[in-house]
């Protein structure tokens, strides 16, 4: 693309209490190879209680492309919709405050959007540890390992561009929102998955571009990781209810694993083979976790490998329990916990 033909791009960044990561994120966006006079950056703040707003305001004083908007409802989908409605761009790009973007990230996405017939294009996230501790480093490994996240291509990567069901964040044609509507504000998490499903159902296409790369800064503790993946699992049944089906089979695996173990434990009271089946399943899972963790030891050291034996179960059990409770609340009882989750950070 030559400079005059580059579309005007609106970058939308919903955030809340992101003072730790915001400087690096904003600096990376401002260093983009995409021309500054062909973009705007709308930071939509969910009424942060830390220094997030001050940081954005200071950057806005020196960089007129940045605007600070308010999101009084706190949660990410509301912030996204506020940003979209206030934006001017022909192309709308969602970005996240927990991420550091390479200078080529935005140009690659925009070019692919225009040349490949896609309605939404995303890149690949390389996961960085949020701290220099064995647990934080293990979390980063787990979030980019197939045992941890399955075939989630935007996390584990792909050798070439491919059409997918969802991507992280996304670079959209404005017409995509005219076609499919805005983000669903009932979904504290997984709102991008639901939107992409809606877009595809209306004839849109979602493309993963492996050459568009960014660095996602992961959570630093097992408690933070548990909370995040519990939320992901919790809102998946609500997404399934809205779209009329489970979007991918990998979403069912953690909850099926937990319910199978529980069923074997209960059945073992009356039928001894059930206990053996449950122990066999648990042993196979433990062997997979230990093998994956041991494989990380030569490169990352035994302390990180030891922490990884905890990271994989946290990912799977938190997601599985969240899914089961979400099934109860969103499908069986219709008692969502959106309000009590609204104060949590927005990042992936």
Regions picked out by a protein language model, each given a short descriptive name:
Residues 103-137, 141, 213, 217:
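Conserved donor NDP-sugar-binding/catalytic core segment of glycosyltransferases
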Residues 45-54, 73, 96-99:
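A conserved acidic beta->alpha catalytic loop
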Residues 51, 97-112, 197:
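Acidic donor-binding/catalytic loop of UDP-sugar-dependent glycosyltransferases
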């Amino acid at each position: 693309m030559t400079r005059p033909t580059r579309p005007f791009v609106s970058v939308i960044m919903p955030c809340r209490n992101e003072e730790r990561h915001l400087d690096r994120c904003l600096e990376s966006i401002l260093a983009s190879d995409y021309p500054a006079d062909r973009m705007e950056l709308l930071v939509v703040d969910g009424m942060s209680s830390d220094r997030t707003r001050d940081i954005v305001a200071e950057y806005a004083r020196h960089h007129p492309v940045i605007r600070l908007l308010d999101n009084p409802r706190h949660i990410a989908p509301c912030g996204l919709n506020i940003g979209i409605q206030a934006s001017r761009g022909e192309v709308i790009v969602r970005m996240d405050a927990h991420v550091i973007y390479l200078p080529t990230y935005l140009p690659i996405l925009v070019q692919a959007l225009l040349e490949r017939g896609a309605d939404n294009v995303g890149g690949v996230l390389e996961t960085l540890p949020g701290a220099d501790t064995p647990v934080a480093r293990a979390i980063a490994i787990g979030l980019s390992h197939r045992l941890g996240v399955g075939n989630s291509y935007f996390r584990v990567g792909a050798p070439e561009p491919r059409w997918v069901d969802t991507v992280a964040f996304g670079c959209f044609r404005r017409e995509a929102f005219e076609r499919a509507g805005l983000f669903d504000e009932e979904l504290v998490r997984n709102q991008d998955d639901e939107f992409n499903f809606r877009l595809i159902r209306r004839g849109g296409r979602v493309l993963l571009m492996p050459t568009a790369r960014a660095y996602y800064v992961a959570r630093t503790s097992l408690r933070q990781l548990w909370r995040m993946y519990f939320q992901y699992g919790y809102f998946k049944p609500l997404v399934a209810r809205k779209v009329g089906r489970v979007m991918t089979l990998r979403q069912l695996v953690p909850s099926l694993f937990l319910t199978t173990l529980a069923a074997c434990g209960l059945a073992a009271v009356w039928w001894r083979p059930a206990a053996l089946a449950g122990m066999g399943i648990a042993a196979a899972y433990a062997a997979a976790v230990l093998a994956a963790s041991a494989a990380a030891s030569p490169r990352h050291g035994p302390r990180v490998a030891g922490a990884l034996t905890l990271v994989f179960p946290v990912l799977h059990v938190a997601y599985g329990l969240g899914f089961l409770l979400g099934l109860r609340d969103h499908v069986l009882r219709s008692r969502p916990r959106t309000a009590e989750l609204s104060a949590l950070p927005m990042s992936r």
